[in-house]
């Protein structure tokens, strides 16, 4: 079944025919437009406070616009065609960066100038690798999050199960703990949803499945990938809830105590601790202790399948992109500010999902990592991460930026990563599979 589904996947690379506009924004040097991919209201409000401080310090006015991740390609294409690109695009995942690069919508010289001004050695090596294409610095990396497999440690311990870090252990746990009341595992399966691709890519990388090889040939029909599709299809068909699942239902089922495992990002950590009122855990035990799931959940980050040569972990590096039509000087000034004076406040918006990939300054190489560890997580209630999670979880977060793997980029085929954001062929295949 998986082989048949994989055979239907076609990745159409984004075209590179759109030439950068000659009409830059240099005459608008006191005003820039900034798009963000982070559209959660409280995060937008917090970012606007940082922007206000930037404007007060520099005199540069900023029009701040939120753009949903799943609509990014469409809106970007429309803006480019109309000659109305923003000056800066923030909170951009790697696929978004590559989409812009493939369509020649990026000012790589400006990005390189920012990295040079801040100090190349103040950034994590992996974050720079992921935001480069050969010698070209496509964007300026800012923070990273990791994909995790959350599991009910209390249920695992009671059943004598090993931590779910291998395909075999994940399947064994899903089979042992699946019941009419509790699903063995929940994970995204919705076609057309980037979260579905992120979920599957995490598991696929663990089994040595790559989307493309170094020659640019799509390899989703490889033995490793077919086995990965089979593995995921088996889990979702036999040990999960019925119907399609998305970012909200996966969280809701795990929070209700109706799933033994769930695949989600590090952004789940504050919510699982009961620190966000509109996303509170609802498990029976959570009524008396809202942090019950946080105290009784483990996390697995680096996973490995039977065909994988070494454990792998999916994650995302977010970046600031300076566009080809930008007012270069104020755009660079803005990005530099967001990675210096505004950086700690930026990370504080959601520390559980914003680990600093700029670790410090030339004078204090660990300044930002040290500050990050003291930040409080949560939305409606704030508390240190260490109040709810053991040091091993904190260590997973701090090491995540250096351990991340991604399809296509390490093979020098980053443009196909951007194309996959627009086409989302893998989520379509997952939808057909389950």
Residue ranges and their predicted role:
Residues 94-146, 196-199, 289-303:
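Hinge/lid segment of periplasmic solute-binding proteins
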Residues 53-123, 154-165, 260-261, 271, ...:
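Extracytoplasmic "Venus flytrap"/periplasmic binding protein-like
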Residues 27-39, 60-65, 87-88, 138, ...:
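Short, well-ordered beta-strand elements
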């Amino acid at each position: 079944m998986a082989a048949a589904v994989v055979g239907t996947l076609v990745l159409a690379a984004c075209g590179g025919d759109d030439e950068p506009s000659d009409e830059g924004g240099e005459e608008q040097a006191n005003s820039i437009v900034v798009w963000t991919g982070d559209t959660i209201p409280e995060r937008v409000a917090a970012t606007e406070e940082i922007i206000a401080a930037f404007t007060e310090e520099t005199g540069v006015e900023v029009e701040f616009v939120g753009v949903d991740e799943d609509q990014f390609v469409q809106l970007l294409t429309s803006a480019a065609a109309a000659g109305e690109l923003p000056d800066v695009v923030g909170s951009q995942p790697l696929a978004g960066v590559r989409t812009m690069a493939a369509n020649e919508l990026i000012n790589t010289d400006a990005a390189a100038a920012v990295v040079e001004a801040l100090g190349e050695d103040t950034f994590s090596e992996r974050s720079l690798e992921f935001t480069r294409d050969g010698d070209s610095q496509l964007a300026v990396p800012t923070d990273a999050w990791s994909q995790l497999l959350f599991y009910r440690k209390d249920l695992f311990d009671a059943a004598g199960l090993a931590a779910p870090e291998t395909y075999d252990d994940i399947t064994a746990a899903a089979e042992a703990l699946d019941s009419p009341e509790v699903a063995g595992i929940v994970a995204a399966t919705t076609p057309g949803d980037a979260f579905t691709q992120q979920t599957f890519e995490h598991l696929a990388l663990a089994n040595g499945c790559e989307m493309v090889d170094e020659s640019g040939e799509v390899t989703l029909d490889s033995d490793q990938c077919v086995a990965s599709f089979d593995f995921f299809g088996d889990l979702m068909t036999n040990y999960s809830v019925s119907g399609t699942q998305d970012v909200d239902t996966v969280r809701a089922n795990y929070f209700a105590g109706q799933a033994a495992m769930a695949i989600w990002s590090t952004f789940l950590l504050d919510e699982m601790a009961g620190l966000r009122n509109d996303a509170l855990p609802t498990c029976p035990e959570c009524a008396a202790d809202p942090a019950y799931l946080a105290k009784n959940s483990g996390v697995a980050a680096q996973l490995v399948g039977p065909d994988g040569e070494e454990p792998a972990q999916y994650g995302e590096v977010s970046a600031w992109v300076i566009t080809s039509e930008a007012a270069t000087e104020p755009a660079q000034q803005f990005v530099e500010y967001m990675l210096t004076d505004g950086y700690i406040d930026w990370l504080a918006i959601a520390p559980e999902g914003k680990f600093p990939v700029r670790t410090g300054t030339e004078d204090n190489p660990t300044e930002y990592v040290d500050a990050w560890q003291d930040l409080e997580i949560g939305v409606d209630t704030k508390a240190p991460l260490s109040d709810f999670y053991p040091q091993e979880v904190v260590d997973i977060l701090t090491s995540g930026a250096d351990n991340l793997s991604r399809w296509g980029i390490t093979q020098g085929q980053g443009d196909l990563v951007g194309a996959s954001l627009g086409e989302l062929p893998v989520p379509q295949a997952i939808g057909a599979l389950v």
